From Swiss-Prot:
CDD domains: TPP_DXS, TPP_PYR_DXS_TK_like. This is 1-deoxy-D-xylulose-5-phosphate synthase. Belongs to the transketolase family. DXPS subfamily. It comes from Deinococcus geothermalis (strain DSM 11300 / CIP 105573 / AG-3a). Its EC number is 2.2.1.7.
Length: 633
């Protein structure tokens, strides 16, 4: 008998997944193997996400659905679109990127969302919600116009479906009647709890049994399937709920879109059976699947909000790596909760970002002065306008990247009448791992272009509080912009007095003066440390500028350096140049900011270094301007 081998490799925990590097490999598996493959995908997703900062719960919930879609459709010929794209980790693994999953959201690695330039299997570049249906319609129209015959399937979550863009696209889809499959992935949650009438309708579908009631058109639609879907309940497992198409009660059918569901989104074999029969039907079809966010991971199923995008954790126990950090979002949430006790006119509105914007406690303490409008940034802003017209002091809590979606409402509904609306703009500047779709580097530029809108960049939590208090006491719209990241906590009751449009000197020096606010001010102070003759000004107001201090420093200094965590096109540096021109001053100015190009995912520090706005880069510029400075910081 031979001796046992001492170094036998342990059996793979993912034997089926190890055989799948493409959708064609997937199709070689038997249908009875698909549940095991989905389980292996989930195990791999948990392992990948345990390093922190990745979208865990949504990817676990969508795994069975993604397996079924790729088993039936032929990507990349057929187009599979994912709304938002953060649930598509299984899609990435099934399309040849499993070996790169450890690079997700890392510099030079895979995107955390789908991205056209990353893979031929990624139909759209995405990161914002509610865009998939309009994209799918465009692809279906292009297919028909060019006489082609590929299939189009869009996966959209119930949270994304609350967005006006998705509903408007659905209305047009029903009107045009082009062949496409819309998979409504109903996990009862986006990042925050879903709200609105459409959400209530879908919740009702899950607790009531609806049946086809005899409309002739509905019967024909059912009979178009090889096995009548009218018999679906008798042949499907108990997890498959029901089918109906009564236009009188179903808003999807009322729009002209065939509706099937709700069905169990974790019965992968049943999903395959349905998709095979629905994807070739004439006209648009919605397949409503009910999934569990965090599926297969008990602690993620129990708290999907916490596990939407967790930090580092132990996959076996779910224990997180502890953090005592205090975020800018938390600083805002604490400040506005206290402010609402002081001023009964305070009312906070957010577009589906309660947790991310630090508003959980506020929503609990002041539930009657809090509104989540869902993924509807335009509605949030115009609702605030209506409140301001009636004497309230609304605060719109919103990420910078999402405020872009409400530019017209800021201009048309708020600014023209100079209404008292405060915009608490979180994630201003580079956000890092989420990349180009989420970087908030355009807000200073587009808000500067709107008359009446003031813009503030607090340097710390105290200044944030001072700006919030000022906004509640003075007239006109005011945008307070702060970065992603951590800040030092300040005591409750801290409300420093701020004078409108004023800057402050933080370091004396009249040879070269650095003007910066917000996150960029940290770099400016570090760069100028122990450099005689180099001044630093906290340019905490981007609009209006402090004309008096600007004239003073520009008259004395050999040169000015502006630093901003915003695009150089039309931002703070541009504002300074415009002001100097109006003042008739010719002081040389070096404008440092984010280049006129989209910035891919990387750490915030890496992007800032690449953009040339971190402390070493500023010191290099100072040296070029003749300052005697060592380049090491």
């Amino acid at each position: 008998m031979s001796e046992p081998t001492a170094n036998l490799q342990p059996a793979s925990r993912t034997p089926l997944l190890d055989r799948v590097n493409s959708p064609e490999d997937l199709k070689r598996l038997g249908r009875d193997q698909l549940p095991q493959l989905a389980a292996e995908l989930r195990e791999e997703i948990v392992r990948v996400c345990s390093v922190g900062g990745l979208h865990l719960a949504s990817s676990l919930g969508a795994t069975d659905l993604i397996v079924a879609l790729h088993y039936v459709l032929h990507s990349p010929r057929d187009r599979i679109l994912f709304d938002v794209g953060h649930q598509a980790y299984a899609h990435k693994m099934l399309t040849g990127r499993r070996h790169l999953m450890h690079t997700v959201k890392k510099e030079g690695g895979l995107s955390g969302f789908t991205k056209v330039s990353e893979s031929e299997h990624d139909a759209i570049t995405v990161g914002h919600a509610s865009t998939s249906l309009a994209n799918a319609l465009g692809m279906a129209l292009a297919r028909d116009a060019l006489g082609q015959d590929y299939k189009v399937a869009a996966v959209i979550g119930d949270g994304s479906l609350t967005g006006g863009m998705a509903l408007a696209a659905l209305n047009t889809i029903g009107d045009l009647g082009r062949r496409m499959l819309i998979v409504l992935n109903d996990n009862e949650m986006s990042i925050s709890e879903n709200v609105g009438a459409i959400n209530r309708f879908m919740r009702g579908l899950q607790v009531q049994k609806w049946f086809q009631e005899g409309e002739e058109a509905g019967k024909k639609a059912v009979q178009a399937v090889s096995k009548p879907l009218a018999n679906l309940m008798s042949r499907a497992k108990s997890s498959t709920r029901h089918f109906f198409d009564p236009a009188s009660v179903n808003p999807f059918a009322a729009m002209g879109v065939r509706y099937v569901g709700p069905v169990d989104g974790h019965n992968v074999q049943e999903l395959v059976w349905l998709i095979e029969r629905l994807v070739d039907l004439d006209g648009p079809t919605i397949l409503h699947v009910v999934t569990k966010k965090g599926k297969g991971l008990s602690y993620a199923e129990a708290d999907p909000i916490k596990w939407h995008g967790p930090g580092k954790f132990d996959p076996a126990t779910g224990e997180s790596v502890p953090s005592n950090a205090y975020s800018w979002s938390s600083a805002f949430g604490d400040a506005v909760t206290e402010l609402a006790r002081l001023d009964p006119r305070t009312f906070v509105i957010t577009p589906a970002m309660r947790e991310g914007s630090g508003l959980v406690r506020y929503s609990q303490v002041h539930p009657h002065r809090y509104l989540d409008v869902g993924i509807a940034e335009d509605v949030a802003v115009t609702t605030a306008a209506g409140m301001a017209l009636q004497g309230m002091r609304p605060i719109v809590a919103i990420y910078s990247t999402f405020l872009q979606r409400a530019y017209d409402q800021v201009l048309h509904d708020v600014a023209i009448e100079n209404l008292n609306v405060t915009f608490a703009i979180d994630r201003g500047g580079i956000v890092g791992a989420d990349g180009a779709t989420h970087n908030g580097v355009f807000d200073l530029s587009y808000l500067r272009s709107i008359p009446n809108v003031g813009i503030g960049l607090p340097k710390d939590a105290a200044e944030l509080r001072g700006m919030l208090k000022y906004a509640q006491e003075h007239a006109g719209p005011f945008a307070i912009r702060y970065p992603r990241g951590n800040v030092e906590r300040v005591p409750e009751g801290t409300w420093p007095e701020l004078r409108w449009g004023t800057w402050e000197r933080l370091q004396d020096g009249d040879d070269v003066v650095i003007l910066a606010g917000g996150k960029a001010l940290e770099y400016a102070l570090k760069a100028a440390r122990d450099l005689p003759g180099v001044g630093v000004v906290n340019a905490r107001f981007v609009k209006p500028l402090d004309q008096g201090m600007l004239r003073e420093v520009a008259t004395k200094a050999r040169a000015l350096v502006t630093v901003e965590d915003n695009t150089v096109v039309g931002g703070f540096g541009s504002a300074v140049l415009e002001a100097l021109s109006a003042l008739g001053l010719r002081t040389p100015v070096r404008v440092l900011g984010i280049p006129d190009a989209f910035q891919d995912h990387a750490t915030v520090e890496s992007v800032h270094a690449r953009a040339g706005i971190d402390a070493p880069a500023i010191r290099t510029v100072l040296a070029e301007l003749g300052v005697d400075v060592p380049l090491e910081v």
